[in-house]
Each structure stands twice: as structure tokens, then as C-alpha cells.
Amino acid sequence: MSIKVTQEKLPASRVGLQIEVSGEQSRQVYERTLTRLSREVRFPGFRPGKVPRPVLIQRLGETALKANAIEDLVQQSLESAIAQESIPAIGNYQLSSDFETLVAAFQPGKSFSFEASVDVQPTATLAQYTGLTVEVAEVPFDANRVDNVLAEQQKQMATLVPVEGRNAAIGDVAVIDFQGILVESGEEIPGGSGTDFQIEVEEDRFIPGFISGIVGMAIEETRTVDATFPETYAQEEVAGKAAQFTITLKELKTRDLPELDDAFAQEASQYETIEELKTALTERFQAEHESEVKASKRDAILTALADQLDVEIPESLLQREISAMINETASRLSGQGMDVRKLFTEEVLERLRENSKDEDEQRLRRTIALGELAKVTETQVDDEAVKARAAELLSNYPRPQEVDRDRLITVVREELLEDKLLEWFEANNSVTFVAPKAAETEVDAASATVETTATETAEEAPEAPKAKKGKKKA
């Protein structure tokens, strides 16, 4: 379809199109629309596709026929305009002209004009990509982590021994009956009561005031404990409210910890000696720390690149990114056994989109900035390196025949390209590690926002007492 197209650059990476279609083309589309409708509509007394044109016009009406023809004409004209002008369009078009006005003015056989707009791939530029100074937040290595993990494993493998001659203290295991009410209304707290619950007497285990009320109790003692739900508590009906719990201490136990010896290592893990277990844990935590350091450096570099980026991100591209993040979160939650169909209501989805918009836009800026750096530095990845890395990953899959090979190649290529670009950036800019600022806890904000919003209503109050866990292999 040969058409006349006038383009206009609009804000937010949109292009305005003024399209003029010849009279002959408008007539042809109108005729094809009539033919299509004559096959699709069903009128009593007429076989499909055999409805006479006068009957079709009379039954459907001239306005409805014109509206159908214009819908076809606009769609076909836009597709032709985008192809003819080589417009890098993304997303759906938006009709700028008033549709009713177009219907009223449309006459088959006469030229037809309309206006529309469409999002296009954004044009991006990096103001600077060399000579930058980037500070990376140091990731402290917890030298006590191995000892802490072993101590926790000791607790899980400990034998519970009845306590005699003293009252409850932090670190004990208690068996209690409890019942909670809201102070203001006197109503019972939903899920706020239990019988023969075994709980760990640990600080910050429950809502403020609950555990401290148990400390000092004697066996068979009943005590009234005041507690307050945090303002940010997941259950809105009790958040920020004062509560009162009646608690009876029925049993009190302490842990008889096993020795950290070879027998412990053999029971807690696949290792024969305690030294082998400590070495394995040390190596694992060091590898995790190296990954965290790499992630911290990546985050700082991508943030610096995004700050140098001049781009207008189209709305359709942003919405696509938001949808991808929601789908990824839904898949992860589903893998954890959650019913995402119940979790992701229309209200929740609307909140997800709104809450994650800023973070998703920032992630898009980083992706675009990295792509622009690849262009200006002419950085590419060798095909053989991609194939070798993909083969290495496939060898670790239990069922490699189920892997989407094309998708794997794409992901590997992107990862290797990113690694090369980050190396190039570090070689051509100043990247230094500095002590993290106070209260600086950088996370994947988009994912955290989405997952928190999706799951915050799944929690119950007060927190259910924890049953003793089974033995864990280190």
C-alpha cells in the first residue's frame, strides 16, 4: 500500500504520523471490508457469504460499515507507513484523530487522512563513559560466619533437657498456652491463641513485649503480658495496636549441645572430620563474598553509566519491563508453593505496577546505558566463547534435552558481553572501594518492592511459635 506519510517527533520517544490514503485505496479497503463482513455475519434466509450488499448495508447500517472499514484502513495504513518509513516502532499505536469524526468524513473512493502516534526505540547517548570516578561500597566479610553457622547447627542437633530450679531465661525452649486480646476492643486476636506451643525464648522472636514477658516466669505460672504490634505489621487490623496476652508456662527446657567434633561433622554433613566441614564452609562463604563484591561493583558501575545517559524511555517499553518483573516474581513465588492466582488480584497487580515503576525505569536505564557503551566501544563477544560457556552450563543440567538452546545462547551472550563491558569500564575509569555509608543497604529494589507487595498480606498475627527444625546438612 503506497501512502503519504508525514512524521513529527514527539516527547517520550514517540513519533506522530499524519497519513494520507488515496481514494482508490480507501475504496479497495471498503470493498474488502464488505466482503469480509458478508462472510462473517449471519442473517436468517441467507447462506454464509451470500448476503446481498443492499441487505448487508440495510441490516448493519452505513455508519457501522464505515467504522469497520476505517478500523481496517487505519491498521493496514499504519503497518504500511511503519514499513515504508523504516520506523523502529514498539508497542501499539494510538489514534490521535477522533474516531467518530473520521467515520462521519469517510467516503469510499476519496482520499482519507488521519493522525496517530507510536512509541519508537529510544535514541540514547552517553555524556561521558571514560575518566569517571566511581565509588563502590565495600562488602564486609563476616569472619565469624563459620562459627555462627556451626553454633546454629549445634542448637538444631541439641537434646532438650528439662530445666529445674530456675525461671525462664533467654535461650530456653518453653511450652506455653497463650491467648491474646486487643486492649482497645477486648476482642480476641485472629490467630492469637494456642495450646502446648513450643517456642524458643529468643529476643525479637515475636512482637515487642511477648518474649520479655515470658522471661522470669516459673513453671505453672500464669502471667498477663502487654505487647504492641508494630505500625508496619502485615495485618492492618492489628497494626500499631496494643495487645494483652495471658500466658501459662507449662514446661521449660534447655539445650544440651553436642561437641564440635568429627562425630558432629559426620552427622551434620557429608564430611568425615570437623576440620573438613570448617574448610568447606569457609570456601563456600568466601565464594559467596566474592560474588557479593562483584555484584556491588556491578551495581555502582551501572548506576554511574545510567547517570551519564540521556534518553527518553517510551511508556510501552516501561510497561513491558514492569510486566516482565511481575511475571518473574510470580514464577518465583509459584515455585515456592504459593497460589499466585489468589495472590495476584487486580488490586495487587495495580499496586505492583505503581510501586515498581521507578525501580523498573532505573533498571531500563542501566540496560540501555550498557547497550550504548557496547556501541560506542564496538565491544562484541566471540561466538566460540558463547558456545563454550553454553556447553559448560548444559553439562551441569540434569536434563539438558529440556533446555531451550536458543534462549540459553541469548542469555550467555548477554552475560559475557556485560562482563567484557564492565572490565572495559573498570580499565578506563577510576573504580575504588569505600566504606559503606551508614544505613546503606542496597538491594534489587524492583524485585523487593514487587515481592513484598505480593506477599505482605500472607503473614498472620501473632507470629506462630516455631517448631523445632530437623537436622540440616551443612
Swiss-Prot record:
InterPro entries named in the record: PPIase_dom_sf, PPIase_FKBP_dom, Trig_fac, Trigger_fac_C, Trigger_fac_C_sf, Trigger_fac_ribosome-bd_bac, Trigger_fac_ribosome-bd_sf, Trigger_fact/SurA_dom_sf
EC number(s) stated in the UniProt entry for this protein: 5.2.1.8
Region span, Disordered: 441-474
Catalytic activity from the UniProt record: [protein]-peptidylproline (omega=180) = [protein]-peptidylproline (omega=0)
Swiss-Prot/TrEMBL keywords: Cell cycle, Cell division, Chaperone, Cytoplasm, Isomerase, Rotamase
Residue stretches making up the PPIase FKBP-type domain: 171-258
Cellular component terms per the entry's GO annotation: cytoplasm
EC category name: isomerase
Molecular-function GO terms, alphabetical: peptidyl-prolyl cis-trans isomerase activity; protein folding chaperone; ribosome binding
Subcellular location: Cytoplasm
Origin: domain of life: Bacteria
One biological process term in Gene Ontology: cell division
One Pfam family of this chain: FKBP_C
Compositional bias ranges of the Low complexity kind: 444-456
Record remark on domains: Consists of 3 domains; the N-terminus binds the ribosome, the middle domain has PPIase activity, while the C-terminus has intrinsic chaperone activity on its own.
PANTHER family in alphabetical order: TRIGGER FACTOR CHAPERONE AND PEPTIDYL-PROLYL CIS/TRANS ISOMERASE, TRIGGER FACTOR-LIKE PROTEIN TIG, CHLOROPLASTIC
Similarity field: Belongs to the FKBP-type PPIase family. Tig subfamily.
Role summary: Involved in protein export. Acts as a chaperone by maintaining the newly synthesized protein in an open conformation. Functions as a peptidyl-prolyl cis-trans isomerase.
Name by which UniProt lists this protein: Trigger factor
Species of origin: Synechococcus sp. (strain ATCC 27144 / PCC 6301 / SAUG 1402/1)
Gene: tig
